[in-house]
Amino acid sequence: LTCKTCPFTTCPNSESCPGGQSICYQRKWEEHHGERIERRCVANCPAFGSHDTSLLCCTRDNCN
C-alpha cells in the first residue's frame, strides 16, 4: 500500500507503508494559523478527536 505523506491540501509525496500498516490516514483540524493536515500510514484507524474537523481512513493507494 502507498499513502500520501505531506501536510498540504495538494500532496505530491507518498511512501510505501511498512509491514503491519495497511491503512492510509488523513486527519484535519483547525489551529489559530489555519487548517492543519496530517497524512500517513497506520495499523489502525484512530478515533475522531475533539479538535478534528475530518478524519479519513482508507485502503487504496494514495487515497488519503
Swiss-Prot record:
Disulfide bonds join 3-24, 6-11, 17-41, 45-57, 58-63. It is found in: Secreted. Belongs to the three-finger toxin family. Ancestral subfamily. The lineage of its organism: Eukaryota, Metazoa, Chordata, Craniata, Vertebrata. This is Micrurotoxin 2. Expressed by the venom gland. It comes from Micrurus mipartitus. It comes from the Eukaryota. It holds the Pfam family Toxin_cobra-type. One of its GO terms (molecular function) is toxin activity. Keywords: Chloride channel impairing toxin, Disulfide bond, Ion channel impairing toxin, Neurotoxin, Secreted, Toxin. Negative results: does not bind to nicotinic acetylcholine receptors (nAChR), muscarinic acetylcholine receptors (mAChR), acetylcholinesterase (AChE) or to receptors for glycine and glutamate. GO terms for cellular component: extracellular region. Allosteric modulator of the GABA(A) receptor (GABR), possibly increasing receptor affinity for the agonist, thus enhancing receptor opening and macroscopic desensitization. In vivo, intracerebroventricular injection into mice results in periods of reduced basal activity, followed by bursts of intense seizures and death.
